Amino acid sequence: MHKNKLPKYFLFVDKYEKNILKNNIINLGIIYRNYLKKQNENDIFKLRSYCNKKKIKFYISNNLKLAIKFKSHGIYIPSFNKRITLNKKNLTKNFAIIGSAHNQMEIKKKIDQGCEAIFLSPLFKVKKNKKYLGVCKFNLLTLKYKNKFFALGGIRKQNINILKILNIYGMAGISYLKKNRPKNLGRFL
């Protein structure tokens, strides 16, 4: 059976912008998540069209109906959503279920929700959160599970090389990937 291949990089966006990226990142997925206001279907349509044109995989956060309506490649379940449990049998075979977690308890919840990949964050120090995992704790959390893990949180030019020693499938970002094309990832490019 053909398994849906996930991108190595993910970019989180909350609205459509004409030039979302200042670079051409190969093997990229875009996750639309907008928690501040009602989801704008016009923005979703424009993002989906942009992704189709650029051959970028497109995912929608927290709304299965919209993900199916706009034929996204999958759904992203944020760490705060503890209710959704999806049955892969009811979805198309290439539909991916991905989620995010901050600790072991949330990782287990995402696995129970059917997530094949998990964004684990924050890896490094970020402005909005004083707590972060760090390299050792991050690796200890990921080694216990067979799921694919993505590094998220605080990734910058100064610490990008550290990703090479992590037990990860790829990385995700909000601002770093918009501005930079990661050049120093070795096995990830």
Identify the residue ranges that each predicted region occupies:
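N-terminal active-site wall of soluble small-molecule enzyme domains
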Residues: K18-N19, G29-N90
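Conserved, mostly hydrophobic/aromatic
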Residues: I30, A67, K110, I118, ...
